[in-house]
Amino acid sequence: MDNVIGLEIIEVVEQAAIASARWMGKGEKDTADHVAVEAMRDRMNKIHMRGRIVIGEGERDDAPMLYIGEELGICTQPDAAQVCNPDELLEIDIAVDPCEGTNLVAYGQNGSMAVLAISEKGGLFAAPDFYMKKLAAPPAAKGKVDINKSATENLQILAQCLDRSIEELVVVVMKRERHNDLIKEIREAGARVALITDGDVSAALSCAFSGTNIHALMGIGAAPEGVISAAAMRALGGHFQGQLIYDPDIVKTGLIGESKESNLARLKEMGISDPDKVYTAEELACGETVLFAACGITPGTLMKGVRFFGGGARTQSLVISTQSKTARFVDTVHMFETPKRPKALQLH
């Protein structure tokens, strides 16, 4: 799968990022997201595959494109029998976030990117639109920190694993009221807190790379993004755990239902028998081969944002593979058209 589709998924996130970046700073987050969705969907439909969205823009009734269950790729089209050999058919599950951090794009802030993860059919956990408690940490701490431990305990373990003092650690937490106690505990333990308003996939990803000055992600964010983060962290060998949050009182507001009971019933309908289960990266992205790709929309910790010039743009992307055990940064120059040159000044 890596050799067949690796370059193409880079182009998918690049096209989404370029489309969204045109709306950077214009205050229209829905438009920035919509154009990214369109660009991502259009490019995926040109890939020789039968793909199925398992994490997308929402349920079919709520999302016109990239909805959960939508099929994409050349081999899903009416004339597929003429161009797709059943013996060589590439069937994959896809998790997407065409514009992670729509507010960041709308207000010209750092940290937004277009992301996706793919695996063979059944290789990605189809997370509901719930919240998820998350813990991400570098490869050195894999299996040593634990989401069931307190933040203080995990910081002590993390400091030991990274051979540094707690005071030298930086923990990313989303700036939400529900995290006030967590933020207080982290600070009292001696670590530093980097607050973000959106974009915890980028934060989780940064934990796995040395030199980013991000050592952990803690707190509660959206579950679908948790699966995408897990795909990247599995490929990078980093630590990731996630636990679904079904009690609305914990998050106060957001994507989950009106009552704890209705959410538990929904999870049961989805076949999730243990709602309190703590999932590892290997369980959330369980496929034999998992690929993750991202492209910066606005500048971030790992990637530069889209930079436009006359007749083109330059992007920086990242593709990670469990198959090749690589993380490749890709710098691409896109030529749109020949820029129009101004007419020579006529002097009389």
UniProtKB/Swiss-Prot annotation:
Catalytic activity: beta-D-fructose 1,6-bisphosphate + H2O = beta-D-fructose 6-phosphate + phosphate; D-sedoheptulose 1,7-bisphosphate + H2O = D-sedoheptulose 7-phosphate + phosphate
Residue sites binding Mn(2+) 1 per the record: D33, E57
Residues the record lists as binding Mn(2+) 2: D97, E100, E225
Domain of life: Bacteria
EC numbers: 3.1.3.11, 3.1.3.37
Subunit structure: Homotetramer.
NCBIfam families hit by this protein: glpX
Name the record gives this protein: D-fructose 1,6-bisphosphatase class 2/sedoheptulose 1,7-bisphosphatase 2
Organism: Acaryochloris marina (strain MBIC 11017)
UniProt lineage: Bacteria, Bacillati, Cyanobacteriota, Cyanophyceae, Acaryochloridales
